Amino acid sequence: MSQRQLAYVFDLNKCIGCHTCTMACKQLWTNRDGREYMYWNNVESRPGKGYPKNWEQKGGGFDKDGKLKTNGIIPIRADYGGTWNYNLLETLVEGKSNQVVPDEKPTWGPNWDEDEGKGEFPNNHYFYLPRICNHCSNPACLAACPTKAIYKREEDGLVVVDQSRCKGYRYCVKACPYGKMYFNLQKGTSEKCIGCYPRVEKGEAPACVKQCSGRIRFWGYRDDKDGPIYKLVDQWKVALPLHAEYGTEPNVFYVPPMNTTPPPFEEDGRLGDKPRIPIEDLEALFGPGVKQALATLGGEMAKRRKAQASELTDILIGYTNKDRYGI
């Protein structure tokens, strides 16, 4: 059991799908040495199949009795999409081709269904869902590892893999219900998001948090009652875990999208009264607390429109870096 737990809150109402977080992580951690296909941080469009493809259907996690599920499916290479080779030499140097193309026809990738969403115009909808390792309090990957290579850091609760102990059995890949454990074929070991702990140890925020241009990411210790994590998760209860039913007690929380876009049109062309993003779709991701969270958010926004003060909206705006993260 770790002494303290670092956690994240992602405000989905502010995410613009720019992937700056993804590129920050990719350039720092996964652009070499067998990690090229890995995206420890990814931003997927929902509704959608996600990354790896259909990760929600691959099992893992714990059952209702708290027992580790052993029926998880290891994603195949195609589920992640290609890291294709291109004819750069022939095109840019030798002049044998006038077009840069991949060496094989792409059929899937990390953002293959980006911005597709669900529904038909003018009632279609989608939103962005950034995902990293949840650094769970009850990690299924840790429970599944027979060599005890996976552990939670005592000082901050980050879940990491001891590469010297990992034997490459991939039980952890099967066990993670979020599809955030990866296998490095070049090294023969499992790897994952490390919460940027080398940066954390220097007092710096993780790269994905620091580089977020939409300022959607909040980061800090769960028990810091003066910090944004505690206030959004425990005090205001507007930040919810993703698929809490998996039983891993994730430490990444999401402020659900508020349906502030116009409601869908009725058949006669008039605006209806139903939310554009169906509440049941949001509850399938974030659980039964969605309605109350949205009601709280809506109420606080209404106060601001009346020029009244709102601590919650001030927190969510996150005027400065210090307002959004720090340890």
Curated annotation (Swiss-Prot):
Keywords: 3Fe-4S, 4Fe-4S, Electron transport, Iron, Iron-sulfur, Metal-binding, Oxidoreductase, Periplasm, Repeat, Transport. Residues 6-35, 124-155, 157-186 form the 4Fe-4S ferredoxin-type domain. [4Fe-4S] cluster 3 binds at residues 133, 136, 141, 176. InterPro entries: 4Fe4S_Fe-S-bd (IPR017896), DMSO_Rdtase_II_Fe-S_su (IPR017839). The keyword S-adenosyl-L-methionine does not apply. It comes from the Bacteria. GO terms for molecular function: 3 iron, 4 sulfur cluster binding; 4 iron, 4 sulfur cluster binding; electron transfer activity; metal ion binding; selenate reductase activity. Its EC number is 1.97.1.9. GO terms for cellular component: membrane; periplasmic space. [4Fe-4S] cluster 1 binds at residues 15, 18, 21, 212. Enzyme isolated from cells grown in a tungstate rich environment shows a 20-fold reduction in selenate reductase activity. Binds 1 [3Fe-4S] cluster. Optimum temperature is 65 degrees Celsius (with reduced methyl viologen as the electron donor). Full activity is maintained up to 60 degrees Celsius, with activity falling to 25% at 70 degrees Celsius. Substituting tungsten for molybdenum at the active site of SerA decreases the overall stability of the SerABC complex, rendering the components less thermostable. Pfam families: Fer4_11, Fer4_2. GO terms for biological process: anaerobic respiration. [4Fe-4S] cluster 2 binds at residues 25, 193, 196, 208. It catalyses: selenite + 2 Fe(III)-[cytochrome c] + H2O = 2 Fe(II)-[cytochrome] + selenate + 2 H(+). Has potential use in bioremediation of waste sites contaminated with selenate, such as agricultural drainage waters. Its cofactor is [3Fe-4S] cluster; [4Fe-4S] cluster. Optimum pH is 6.0. Activity is also optimum at pH 6.0 in the presence of tungsten. Its main location: periplasm. Heterotrimer of alpha (SerA), beta (SerB) and gamma (SerC) subunits. This is Selenate reductase subunit beta. It comes from Thauera selenatis.
